[in-house]
Amino acid sequence: MNVVETSSEMNSNVEKASTPKQENNKRFERKSRPSSRQKVVKDEFEEKVVTIRRVTKVTKGGRHFRFAAVVVVGNKKGLVGMGTGKANEVPEAIKKAIKEAKKNLVSVTLRNTTVPHEVLGTFGAGKILIKPAKVGTGIIAGGPARAVIELSGISDVYAKSLGSNNAINMIRATFEGLSSMQTLKRVQELRYGKTFDKQKVALVEKTAETKNFEKKPPKSTTKKMASKKIEKEDVIAEPMIKNEAENSAE
């Protein structure tokens, strides 16, 4: 009897016939290694674009338009940076600014959620006054200074601009103010050395007090003393003059 093969059986036979070739090909296939470029590393820094301006360059051929971006970068743990970038397109300018900002990072001293003390930061005509605030106050600041304070990790602070409204000057003034802040421990180390001792501090303060006490009295006290001496001399001289007058009369 003639046996008629179905289509499914024919396909299975074809697959079985092709399996040895596939096995040989698998042996000589090159396995791809995981490259370091493909690994996506999470960046801990956050970016904020402060300003984007269109700038022009006039040449003989005409005007060339470009874009300038100012970006602030920070990890909200005490590291902040600022950068500027120029390019023919906005995304390229922002990328350049971010790259420059990560190179110019500044460490900021924090005291819980605020700054350790009041400070006035200046750069050119820009002036920024920064004051500590209680927990729950929030960031009371505006303009470019707010972006720097937020990304530095400060959550309770007062900030006021007292000078120029130029974005770059304001940002650099805030950087100057935040970077100049110091903790109490650091101030004590600068005054009394790294080996800070309370007894040593007490001795230094006592010696300062004694030196101030040994100094000459102020001019007002010296004048009073001189006037009292003159009065005493007058009191002593009056009876002597009377006695001399009586003797001369006799």
Swiss-Prot record:
Record keywords, A-Z: Ribonucleoprotein, Ribosomal protein, RNA-binding, rRNA-binding
Gene Ontology CC annotations of this record: small ribosomal subunit
An example molecular function term from Gene Ontology annotations: structural constituent of ribosome
Domain of life: Bacteria
Comp. bias intervals (Polar residues): 1-22
A Pfam match: Ribosomal_S5
Domain S5 DRBM stretches: 45-108
GO biological process, one term: translation
Family listed: Belongs to the universal ribosomal protein uS5 family.
Domain notes: The N-terminal domain interacts with the head of the 30S subunit; the C-terminal domain interacts with the body and contacts protein S4. The interaction surface between S4 and S5 is involved in control of translational fidelity.
Function: With S4 and S12 plays an important role in translational accuracy. Located at the back of the 30S subunit body where it stabilizes the conformation of the head with respect to the body.
UniProt subunit comment: Part of the 30S ribosomal subunit. Contacts proteins S4 and S8.
Protein known as: Small ribosomal subunit protein uS5
